[in-house]
Amino acid sequence: MPPSIAVIIPCLDEETAIERVVRGMRAALPESAIYVYDNGSTDHTVEKAAEAGAVVRTEPLRGKGNVVRRMFADVEADVYVLVDGDGTYDAAAAPRMVQRLLDEQLDLVNGARVSSLAGAYRAGHRSGNALLTWMVARIFGDRFRDLLSGYRVMSRRFVKSFPAVATGFEIETELTVHALELRMPVGEVETRYDERPAGSVSKLRTWSDGLRIVRTIVRLVKEERPLQFFFAIAAALAAASIILAWPVLQEYERTGLVPRFPTAILSTGVMILASLSLTCGFVLDTVTRGRREMKRLHYLRERAPVPAAHGVSSTIQRRGVSGST
């Protein structure tokens, strides 16, 4: 029996694009179930999505992360196609991404955006994405080229083991780190990235959302790499302690006296804080390893992607689709 596919589309005030997105996904994956989760639109997004044939649901808590959390909890399928409702992603790439996930038994296929249009991918967003992708690659592993892509194909065990915490656009960072931390089999496919349709406005605020993503990366480092995080703090504190103590030690070596007691006490206190920080790092590293093992066991409880040997690959090639509702 072929795997079921669900296309899940978070959106907010996308009346100019949502109908085209739904119809495009229906043409690319005609046997899939398409869900549009509205995040409190004030225009005709809900009506347009329903007219296009999507199952429309609402999430009152504002923020893309809240919508993704709700979709992952509500929708049941074997394969999930997550795509933004702004009309910038190429629906025709979906069958290729689904096929790769099934053929190679991957848990995540990321759609790496490629665009030759100057207005499609703003320079600030491009450079910010490159910087954030580099940061995550240095800390968690270099397996993706587009950290903030809103176009992903995921297995059921990826979705149902994902503990969504983010509330906004930083959800993409969490999705990526989830795959990297559990060492899941992943892949990446280049996809065309187009301009938004006329009248559609991006909800991404370059600076504020960029800072939220940076804070998310710092939080994930603290939670997933506590030893490195607290070692860095301990090293900074130890360096400050040594800098404070150095003139006191020189004075003691020269005169045999310690006339600067406040500085000596401060230096000692800072070094104690450094030791405590390092101790916290070791303790939390042990806790994190246990938590990661539990997440891995929960991940393994879910069904794996169906391999191509079950005839799914030929179905995609023949009809541009795999799965049933």
PLM feature segments, named:
Residues M1, V165-A166, I171-T325:
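Hydrophobic helical membrane-anchoring modules
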Residues S4-A6, A33, E174:
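Cell-envelope/extracellular polymer assembly enzymes that use nucleotide-activated donors
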Residues D13-A27:
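Short, well-formed alpha-helical segments that are part of the catalytic scaffolds
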Residues E14-A17, S41, K64, D90:
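Donor nucleotide-sugar binding loop of glycosyltransferases
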Residues D38-V46:
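A conserved acidic beta->alpha catalytic loop
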Residues E59-D74, A91-F169, T173, D194-L211, ...:
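Acceptor/aglycone-binding surface of glycosyltransferases and processive sugar-polymer synthases
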Residues Y80:
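Short aromatic/hydrophobic "clamp" motif used to bind/position activated sugar donors
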Residues D84-Y89:
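The conserved acidic donor/metal-binding loop of glycosyltransferases
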